């Protein structure tokens, strides 16, 4: 938004303060200023001069030598203009002037010196057309020696305000509103208030009819006669041009002028056009779907039912608050008009803008929410401006219409301690009263409590709560005057959040050490997906209207991870993903919600493939990854047990069991296995998937038990050794049985043992499987000898034989 300093000076003496002080106060206490620039400063180098003499150029038939006088000295100009004569007042660009990309210099034309250039309106960028030199004879205030900038009222500073910073302040979207704010901040008086304009309405002028309804907060119309349409006076033209508004004629320009001055849009209808439709009967109503009519911008959009219209005799003449109709607009022959001044619901205007795609200066102000009681004062001010702009025989009827939302007092109660505590300063009652009364609030005190009456131009959506008053006081005092001091607080060791700490460790280990990718999924899924793991009858149904595929809260992370896998299965040969999420059950607390850590690994083939050795190796590899994570957080006491879960392949699933709590009871911490082929098919998965799911709270509990026990052992400086041993065990027998027996032998050098491969078929007896174990040996005192390694190997072989295991 552009604001003219000269225009605002009509209301308060800003020019007495100085530009730097104004800009500083605006930046600190009001809003952001994008720029503050002089308007057309180059025109200071163009003066009004009088032609003293004319003579032919001795060497060029189409040129003339002109002697001009600027009030203090004479100059010689060579020109090709043919429309000038002695005594004419014309604009002269003196040497040093820059007009566009052209710089005026002293020069010689065919041997004759020329000290400047006589200019047309086009050369001064005042018009798109220029037929010869601009003749200023008879124009008001066209005086010899005056600069064109001063003559055109262009001697001004234009502020460009960042609109986003005043979206909440509709009272600042006008010159008077902004000047009023600056007067409050700079302790200046208001010398003229346009809202206090007076007008004697004429009872002889026929009244228009306005149909009352609830589609507007306020709507008034006045019938005006004695109108003459011609170009606006230079003051009106210059002020509109400086604010980036196109000049049209003296009537339409007043409508734009009063909007920029007071922030209240108005509209003028051609009265004769309205009367041709029948008796004038204006109404605010909604459009019919597909309805259209020609607008001022030459468009005729097909309207939706949510668009608000102004109708006369049921026929549309304007889109309310957005744009007027072309046929009802003021014409050059117009002698009578009907003036509209209204305030519409901001929500309605926003819908009209969205529906039509039309965003005008009027609609920008309406969508912010205007004060409904300003409509009548604006009519009186507009009538005065019409008269000032040339309509000297003006007569106007008493405005007719309605006001549905009269001014309601907004009172805010607070106390001095609240204000000082929020600002971090100590203000007295006098300080607070001074600031608020300068901002036009009315303050009354009862002890340390105060009651504040909000001015009517601020109570709409703006100042409504005590915190708003704190902001008003703080910005007016100046945030730069509030001393910055560090917050003083007792330094305490933060409470350790084990859940968050372990979650971070887990994410780091799986993402960095094991190369998994973390995924995030919604907690909503379908009732059918809840059937895969758990009792679907325990599903928690979402009360909101949701599509069937998002109708319940999930009871497992499996469906989400399988869908992630399906999305990526054609892009990657191997997928390793994990997720931390919550699952929900229709059970009493605390069983109604659990935090789960789960992962899915998709490899090359489905679990129906005959290469069982490869399947076993992959499974053992993932199992080893889980064990390495448990070891990284110092959890060593656990076992894997076979357990049948419907989501897993019958022959490939384990549960992780550990002792936890004071009673030391065994509890299931999680599950690991190949996802059942039927489930893979239902999710359209082409590859086999290993899925692991663990109750995170159980892992946290185990970690908390074990983290307090120091298990650090200095790494051995001697090479480690490994022993591999393959034995036959029952097809359905737990492979951990043998490793548990080995642990009971308490071999001092034995660090750990694990299954690294399994095999069935071939020459392995039916009902049996070949299991290969690997044992890691560490000696902290000496290098292993072959004899010692053989002793340990023989001890393991004897142990296997004693317990009925056959060597392979």
From Swiss-Prot:
Its EC number is 6.1.1.20. The keyword ATP-binding applies. Binds 2 magnesium ions per tetramer. Mg(2+) binds at residues 462, 468, 471-472. One of its GO terms (molecular function) is ATP binding. One of its GO terms (cellular component) is phenylalanine-tRNA ligase complex. Belongs to the phenylalanyl-tRNA synthetase beta subunit family. Type 1 subfamily. Tetramer of two alpha and two beta subunits. This is Phenylalanine--tRNA ligase beta subunit.
């Amino acid at each position: 938004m552009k604001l003219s300093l000269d225009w605002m000076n009509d209301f308060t003496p800003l020019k007495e303060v100085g530009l730097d002080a104004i800009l500083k106060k605006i930046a600190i206490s009001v809003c952001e200023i994008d720029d503050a620039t002089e308007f057309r400063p180059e025109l200071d180098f163009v003066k009004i001069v009088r032609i003293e003499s004319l003579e032919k150029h001795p060497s060029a038939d189409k040129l003339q030598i002109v002697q001009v006088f600027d009030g203090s000295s004479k100059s010689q100009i060579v020109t090709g203009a043919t429309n000038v004569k002695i005594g004419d007042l014309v604009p002269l660009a003196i040497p040093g002037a820059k007009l566009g990309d052209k710089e005026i210099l002293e020069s010689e034309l065919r041997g004759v010196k020329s000290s400047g250039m006589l200019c047309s309106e086009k050369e001064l960028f005042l018009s798109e057309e220029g037929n010869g030199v601009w003749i200023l004879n008879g124009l008001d205030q066209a005086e010899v020696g005056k600069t064109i900038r001063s003559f055109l009222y262009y001697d001004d500073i234009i502020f460009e305000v960042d609109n986003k910073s005043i979206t909440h302040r509709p009272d600042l979207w006008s010159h008077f509103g902004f000047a009023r704010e600056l007067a409050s901040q700079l302790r200046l008086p208001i010398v003229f208030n346009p809202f206090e304009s007076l007008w004697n309405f004429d009872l002889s002028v026929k009244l228009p009819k306005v149909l009352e309804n609830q589609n507007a907060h306020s709507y008034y119309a006045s019938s005006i006669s004695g109108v003459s349409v011609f170009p606006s006076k230079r003051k009106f033209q210059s002020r509109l041009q400086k604010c980036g508004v196109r000049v049209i004629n003296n009537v339409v320009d007043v409508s734009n002028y009063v909007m920029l001055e007071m922030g209240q849009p108005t509209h003028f209808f051609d009265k004769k056009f309205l009367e041709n439709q029948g008796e004038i009967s204006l109404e605010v109503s909604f459009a019919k779907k597909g309805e259209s009519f020609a607008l001022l911008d030459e468009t005729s959009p097909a309207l939706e039912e949510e668009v608000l219209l102004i109708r006369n005799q049921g026929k549309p003449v304007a889109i309310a608050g957005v744009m007027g109709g072309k046929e009802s607009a003021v014409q050059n022959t117009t002698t009578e008009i009907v003036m509209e001044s209204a305030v519409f619901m901001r929500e309605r205007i926003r819908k009209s803008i969205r529906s039509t795609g039309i965003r005008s200066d009027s609609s920008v102000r309406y969508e912010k929410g205007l004060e409904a009681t300003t409509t009548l004062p604006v009519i009186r001010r507009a009538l005065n401006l019409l008269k000032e702009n040339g309509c000297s025989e003006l007569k106007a009827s008493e405005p007719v219409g309605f006001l549905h939302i009269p001014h309601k007092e907004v009172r805010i109660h607070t106390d001095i301690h609240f204000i000082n505590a929020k600002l971090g300063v100590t203000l007295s009652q006098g300080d607070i009263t001074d600031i608020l009364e300068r901002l036009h609030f009315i303050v009354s005190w009862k002890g340390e409590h105060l009651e504040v009456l909000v001015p009517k131009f601020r109570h709409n959506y703006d100042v409504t709560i005590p915190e708003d008053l704190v902001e008003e006081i703080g910005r007016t005092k100046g945030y730069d005057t509030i001393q910055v001091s560090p917050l003083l607080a007792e330094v305490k060791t933060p409470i350790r959040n084990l859940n968050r700490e372990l979650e971070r460790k887990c994410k780091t280990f799986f993402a960095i050490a094991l190369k998994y990718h973390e995924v995030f999924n919604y907690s909503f899924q379908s009732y059918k997906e809840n059937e895969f793991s758990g009792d679907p009858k325990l599903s928690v149904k979402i009360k909101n209207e949701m599509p069937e595929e998002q109708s319940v809260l999930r009871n497992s992370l499996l469906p989400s991870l399988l869908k992630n896998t399906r999305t990526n299965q054609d892009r990657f040969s191997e997928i390793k993903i994990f997720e931390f999420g919550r699952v929900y059950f229709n059970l009493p607390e605390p069983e109604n919600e659990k935090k789960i850590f789960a992962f899915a690994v998709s490899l090359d083939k489905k679990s129906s493939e005959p290469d069982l050795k490869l399947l076993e190796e992959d499974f053992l590899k993932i199992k080893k990854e889980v064990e390495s994570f448990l070891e990284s957080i110092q959890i060593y006491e656990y076992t894997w047990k076979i357990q049948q879960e419907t989501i897993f392949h019958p022959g490939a699933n384990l549960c992780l069991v550990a002792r936890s709590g004071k009673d030391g009871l065994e509890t299931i911490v999680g599950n690991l296995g190949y996802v059942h082929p039927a489930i893979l098919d239902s999710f359209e998965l082409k590859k086999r998937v290993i899925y692991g799911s663990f109750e995170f709270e159980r892992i946290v509990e185990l970690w908390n038990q074990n983290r307090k026990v120091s298990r650090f052992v200095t790494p051995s400086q001697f090479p480690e050794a490994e022993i591999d041993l393959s034995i036959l065990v029952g097809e359905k027998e737990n492979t951990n049985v043998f490793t548990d027996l080995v642990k009971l032998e308490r071999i001092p050098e034995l660090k750990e043992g694990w299954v690294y491969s399994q095999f069935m078929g071939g020459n392995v007896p039916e009902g049996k499987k070949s299991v290969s174990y690997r044992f890691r040996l560490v000696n902290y005192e000496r290098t292993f000898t072959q004899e010692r390694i053989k002793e340990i190997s023989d001890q393991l072989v004897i142990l296997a034989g004693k317990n009925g295991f056959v060597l392979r």
